[in-house]
């Protein structure tokens, strides 16, 4: 199972989280986000991490060419799209970045929201399901309706996000079977400031699910 801790802003925390066993670190490249980091920060954080893990850049409604320019200047291995990007947009980005994983995040409000995920099946590598919030794109602390998602089984890998934390992760993964999880606010003291004790507890409770 892929374990992504998103909203990394500090080199020491990034290094510690990678050492604890996370398989991916997420970096927010949306200027309006309280977890926003610049290219220089990403490079400083990733330079401090000796382990081979995924570095995922999170964008929202950015121009594909701008994303391409940022990817060239960083060690980001994946691009996560968290805005209103269309399948056509995703295909265009894939043409520009053929050797990078493209992840499309879907902000789920109701069953119809995740049923519409089918339009992305042929244009991205991975899906991510996050809880809908009218003002925030992510890191809301809101959970999805796990029971309603029980039948969600797309033909490509997917991440579960939305309000996951050490206290609810076992229940979430007992009900659902994603290929990865994405956690941000659930292991924070404040936006961008990770609580390493919470991260360690999360990873401890994930141990029994890691080989699934």
UniProtKB/Swiss-Prot annotation:
| EC number assigned by the record | 5.3.1.24
Enzyme class, broadest EC rank = isomerase
Gene Ontology molecular function: any one:
phosphoribosylanthranilate isomerase activity
* Residue pairs linked by disulfide bridges in the UniProt entry: none
Q: Which Pfam families match?
A: PRAI
GO terms for biological process? L-tryptophan biosynthetic process
Give UniProt keywords alphabetically: Amino-acid biosynthesis, Aromatic amino acid biosynthesis, Isomerase, Tryptophan biosynthesis
Q: Which reaction does it catalyse?
A: N-(5-phospho-beta-D-ribosyl)anthranilate = 1-(2-carboxyphenylamino)-1-deoxy-D-ribulose 5-phosphate
Which CDD domains does the record match to this protein? Answer: PRAI
Query: Pathway, according to UniProt?
Result: Amino-acid biosynthesis; L-tryptophan biosynthesis; L-tryptophan from chorismate: step 3/5
Does Transmembrane helix show up as a keyword for this record? no
PANTHER family for the chain:
N-(5'-PHOSPHORIBOSYL)ANTHRANILATE ISOMERASE
Q: Which NCBIfam families match?
A: PRK01222.1-4 (NF002298)
Its family remark reads:
Belongs to the TrpF family.
Q: What is this protein called?
A: N-(5'-phosphoribosyl)anthranilate isomerase
> Which species is this record about?
Microcystis aeruginosa (strain NIES-843 / IAM M-2473)
